Amino acid sequence: MSDHVKITPMTLNFGPQHPAAHGVMRLVLEMGGEVIERIDPHIGLLHRGTEKLIEYKTYLQALPYFDRLDYVSPMAQEHAYSLCVEKLLKCEVPIRAKYLRVIFCELTRILNHLLNISSQALDIGAMTPLLWMFEEREKILNFYERASGARFHSAYIRPGGVAADIPEDLIHDIFQFVNTFPKFMDDVDSLLTENRIWKQRNVDIGVVSKKQALNWGFSGPMLRACGIPWDLRKSQPYEIYDELEFKIPIGEKGDCYDRYLVRMAEIRESISLVEQCLNRIPDGPVKTDDRKIAPPKRSEMKKSMEALIHHFKLYSEGYIVPAGETYMAVEAPKGEFGVYIVSDGTNKPYRCRIRAPGFAHLQAIDMMAKGHMLADLTAIIGSLDIVFGEIDR
């Protein structure tokens, strides 16, 4: 009898109903025993035709679609779209609105990373971080609700500014949150960072070199974990980021553990950014004074018939955007989220193209997981931080 047993390759379906699939991901795996030889990701199970739907909506009506792309960090998407429309309109945003945008975008980054780290830990088998982190996420979602009226799909950041100003007591509560939050992060650090099992499951798993990361179009924490200090908030500053002080956390190896460390460090940097904004935020309007874009105040509408007509026209017909095309990208929690709009001089976009960071990261899963064990795949997927709303669009 031969000592060598021939292992026949096996095809395995991972998802789309798998708890570690982070949504509706389907992977077709070619296995050589317990080792992954090839991965074929199947996308499109959450395709809703967002880009096409936007062509039939006015510029303001198109905004809520962006909340529903990466539904874990909604305000970052609204921000990219609003900046893009403002660039076409050549519209100036009040300074207080810029500060509010940065505050909520950085809270969104914390919201996103808390979910990612907790779900990555849960996939590997650590349950405590999920319970702890969801308690903190709830506080941020509460801030969302107090600012916009909605916990998730807020439609708060709009072309021309933000939907409404926030009350003084909300600023006070956010301040209290950022003062107590670093202590919570220290607790999470003590739970995971030097944990023996956590390190065994993440160190040297899914290693990506600098060259590979650039070739695959990585951005965000996925790129920075490879040692490339690329952050749009520093390299192509928008809003008031050039006035704020923050570091760009980078990794060394580009493995799952480095990606975790980068996200942990980014949470701390975001806390610092929110604190700086709260200390500096000036008084003033939160919407542009261009009445062709911003609706009149409620108090004005109660007195003036013209204001009421204006409000109705603005929300039914929308505003005309000058013909042209532009691309605008923001440093979303998952990477570079870009919006490309072509305007034909009407009240609806002629074409809107969305550049989702998760799409590029999912493409590289075959390269990252090849040669690893099946059990390591959950750690790799967790570290990718993918949400199918933005990948399938």
Curated annotation (Swiss-Prot):
EC number: 7.1.1.-
Topology of the protein relative to the lipid bilayer: Peripheral membrane protein
Subcellular localization, as worded in the UniProt entry: Cell inner membrane
Record keywords, A-Z: Cell inner membrane, Cell membrane, Membrane, NAD, Quinone, Translocase, Transport, Ubiquinone
PROSITE patterns per record: COMPLEX1_49K
Recorded GO MF terms: NAD binding; NADH:ubiquinone reductase (non-electrogenic) activity; quinone binding
Catalytic activity of the protein: a quinone + NADH + 5 H(+)(in) = a quinol + NAD(+) + 4 H(+)(out)
InterPro entries: NADH_Q_OxRdtase_suD, NADH_UbQ_OxRdtase_49kDa_CS, NDH1_su_D/H, NiFe-Hase_large
EC class name: translocase
GO cellular component: plasma membrane
HAMAP family: NDH1_NuoD
Assembly notes: NDH-1 is composed of 14 different subunits. Subunits NuoB, C, D, E, F, and G constitute the peripheral sector of the complex.
Family listed: Belongs to the complex I 49 kDa subunit family.
The protein's role, per its UniProt record: NDH-1 shuttles electrons from NADH, via FMN and iron-sulfur (Fe-S) centers, to quinones in the respiratory chain. The immediate electron acceptor for the enzyme in this species is believed to be ubiquinone. Couples the redox reaction to proton translocation (for every two electrons transferred, four hydrogen ions are translocated across the cytoplasmic membrane), and thus conserves the redox energy in a proton gradient.
Protein name per its UniProtKB record: NADH-quinone oxidoreductase subunit D
Organism lineage string: Bacteria, Pseudomonadati, Pseudomonadota, Alphaproteobacteria, Rickettsiales
Gene: nuoD
